[in-house]
Amino acid sequence: MKVTKGYADYITFLFDDEQGSPIISNLLKEEVLIEKCICRVVDTITGYYEKRIEIKDSVILRLDMYAAYIYGGLTITNSVIGYFRLMDGGYNREPIIIRNCVFLGEVDFDESVLKNDIIIEDCIFLKGHDFVEDIRYAVMKEEYFKVKI
């Protein structure tokens, strides 16, 4: 799934089988790329993401990844995010990489379980970085915690 160069009011990841029948399994098997977009809301819906989700060079008012199992990992680079929630999810088999971003609002990792590296570098958090303790509790091994704020 690829969304590039433009404005989208609402992006959500819907699940269906090969015949287009509605939600049989909530496993998305393809990579997701959101690039050079301006979007009001990106909502992952509760689901399982086998491949990497990548957001780059974008502006997103609300990035809501509630109960998203991001097995393939997540990369957010060179973007401005209003509100970001990765809550009650995680379970990443691949790294979560957040680099060169500006976060305008709350950042929420509450109740996530992180099973691989989480790398946060060169980001600005206008509402502070209280969420760092949530990440520290979420990582399954201390060496996965690679946050430089």
Residue ranges, per PLM feature:
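N-terminal leader/targeting and pre-domain segments
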Residues: 1-149
